[in-house]
Amino acid sequence: MSGAFAAMQKRFDVFGVLIIAFVTAVGGGTIRDILLDKPVFWTKDIFICGVIFLSTIAAIFIKSIEKNFKVTLFLFDSIGLGLFTIIGIQKGLQADLHPIICITLGTITGCFGGIIRDILLNRIPLIFRKEIYATACIVGGAFFILLEKYSSFTLSFSQISTILVIVIIRTLSLKYHWKMPKIR
């Protein structure tokens, strides 16, 4: 939904809002699959396109009350970031890649849709200037790798714990205004 809301702020028409929402939702996973030389995930599952379409239509209708749901939208965005990070890492692990590459794939999966969105909207990407976003993916990804490689916890426990770590990092960074240092 963040893509749809960003496009509506720029006063795009319905088609533009749909395109920006779509690119935001699938951009990171698309880049990941291209890097892994795998079929792009959304081309194999029309359900994904349907969910994006319906979510975008819902975003258009709730735009007027968006301010009432900022905390909820932030929470869902953070949960989605954690989920996409885990998906990217697991794709790397399935390809038997080095853990650092797996964390990189998780970060790409979680963040690059937003980077593409911001570039299409003619903005400096948010993760390069404002929020702790990619850092949350990297820390959460390292946590996931450690749990998977060196613990006897179940996969589900590792996944849920990692999502919680990412949500907590995002929440604390917003609450306490954490930012990455700027290079001057």
Residue ranges of predicted features:
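Cytoplasmic-side transmembrane-helix entry/capping segments in multi-pass membrane proteins
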Residues: 15-21, 45-49, 70-81, 105, ...
